[in-house]
From Swiss-Prot:
Organism: Chlorobium luteolum (strain DSM 273 / BCRC 81028 / 2530)
Family: Belongs to the DNA glycosylase MPG family.
Catalytic activity, EC: 3.2.2.-
Gene3D superfamilies, sorted: Methylpurine-DNA glycosylase (MPG)
UniProt cross-references to InterPro entries, sorted A to Z: Formyl_transferase-like_C_sf, MPG, MPG_sf
Protein name from the UniProt record: Putative 3-methyladenine DNA glycosylase
Pfam families: Pur_DNA_glyco
Lineage of the organism: Bacteria, Pseudomonadati, Chlorobiota, Chlorobiia, Chlorobiales
GO molecular function annotation: alkylbase DNA N-glycosylase activity; DNA binding
GO biological process, one term: base-excision repair
NCBIfam families the UniProt entry points to: 3mg, PRK00802.1-3
Length: 196
């Protein structure tokens, strides 16, 4: 499979929520373990006209990574206990990102099972906090990009349009009406969260 380069991220954020589905997210751990997950669920967040976005008011120290170049990882700590993985998708200087909500485990499953303390494959990455735990992604990963040797995306066949579902986003209290969540209809690895 071919690595996806910077050109892939020139598409608009809302288009990337769909284009990222089916792609393979890869993390190489410091010990050399290869961890791979197929993206099956995404959500878009934009700095303008989206009150659910961390950067909708202004740039701060907390959200500054959202203003960096497309393909940069934005990892934040939610509710004081969960790391969530986003990929920056807007041109540098403009805030926007796609939250990776769920993946299907592809490689490195024993390592993921150990991290997650479960052998049930559908429970390994079926939620945004679960997948960061399985991959060992923490805030220290924020600001790194997908074009090096630790994190990258591999191209893979895109799902058929009929298999892609759209809904409002999960677990938000503002801008709840925006239909900016995409997921694969046939995947048992999609999160169980209900749209807002």
């Amino acid at each position: 499979m071919t690595r996806l380069g910077k050109q892939f991220f020139t598409a608009p954020t809302l288009a990337l929520t769909e284009r990222l589905l089916g792609k393979i997210f890869v993390r190489i751990t410091p010990s050399g373990t290869v961890l791979k997950g197929r993206i099956v669920e995404t959500e878009a967040y934009l700095g303008h006209n989206d009150e659910a976005c961390h950067a909708w008011r202004k740039k701060t120290e907390r959200n500054r990574v959202m203003f960096e170049a497309p393909g940069t990882l934005y990892v934040y700590f939610s509710y004081g206990c969960h790391h969530l993985l986003n990929i920056v998708t807007e041109p540098e200087g403009t805030a926007g990102a796609v939250l990776i909500r769920a993946m299907e485990p592809v490689e490195g499953i024993p390592c993921m099972q150990e991290r997650r303390q479960t052998t049930v494959e559908t429970a390994l990455m079926s939620g945004p906090a679960k997948l960061t735990s399985a991959l060992g992604v923490e805030r220290s990963s924020s600001g790194r990009d997908l074009f090096g040797n630790e994190f990258f995306l591999l191209d893979a066949p895109s799902p058929q349009p009929s298999m892609i579902c759209t809904s409002t986003r999960v677990g938000i209290s503002r801008s709840r009406e925006l239909p900016w969540r995409k997921y694969l209809a046939d995947s048992p690895h999609v999160s169980k969260g209900r749209p807002s």
